[in-house]
Design a protein with these regions (language model features):
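ATP-dependent NMP and nucleoside kinases share a basic, alpha-helical "lid"
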Residues: 56-110
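NTP-dependent small-molecule kinase module
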Residues: 39-41, 63-64, 104-107, 126-168
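Short, charged, surface-exposed secondary-structure boundary motifs
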Residues: 30, 98-101, 154-155
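N-terminal phosphate/diphosphate-binding loop that engages ATP/GTP or pyrophosphate donors
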Residues: 1-40
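Amphipathic alpha-helical transducer elements in NTP-driven molecular machines
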Residues: 23-31, 82, 92, 111, ...
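Phosphate-binding/switch loop-helix module in NTP-utilizing enzymes
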Residues: 33-68, 76, 164-167
């Protein structure tokens, strides 16, 4: 995960981080590592500790492949990153679905309480979605509505297959 390392900041301050703003991301590192993967070089991807609100000491070794899948709500927000992508997919979900998924994930996997998740959603997640995420919809090659579009899935699959065929 490419959230910035915040180990030099007190935990109470880290808890206030707006993770839905592009400044929370270490985009330069992501771009560098994606370029290395595309050049056939392995990379050590950082691992983020959501309970401590900072990067952990662990890394995940990622080997280069013919197809590299990159996902994240802010992936299309940076032009330099968009320019490195062969196909750009925007997955659309309505606001109710987004908040329900977030509550379930953050309570189950990140040790958060529901009240805190709802407050964060209303104060940062929702406004940042409309400011930084939704405007990137028009930059996508394909828009998929929460997995309910088999034609879009077929287009993505066929595009990936074409990339694989050309790589051989």
């Amino acid at each position: 995960n490419y959230y910035r390392d915040q180990s030099d900041i007190p935990l109470e301050e880290r808890r206030k981080t707006n993770y839905d703003h592009p400044d929370a991301m270490e985009t330069e590192l992501l771009i560098r590592q994606l370029m290395n993967l595309k050049a056939g070089k392995a990379v050590d991807c950082p691992v983020y500790d959501y309970t401590q609100h900072t990067r952990s000491d662990q890394v995940v070794r990622v080997e280069p492949k013919k197809v590299i899948l990159l996902e994240g709500i802010l992936v299309l927000a940076d032009e330099r990153l968009r320019d490195l992508l062969d196909i750009k997919v925007y997955v659309e979900a309505d606001a109710d679905e987004r908040i329900l998924r977030r509550i379930i994930r953050d309570v189950k996997e990140r040790g958060r309480d529901m009240e805190g998740v709802v407050e964060q959603y209303l104060t940062t997640v929702k406004p940042m979605h409309y400011l930084y995420v939704e405007p990137t919809r028009c930059m996508a090659d394909i828009v998929i509505n929460s997995g309910k579009n088999p034609v879009a899935f077929t287009l993505v699959k066929n595009t990936i297959q074409k990339i694989l065929d050309e790589a051989e």
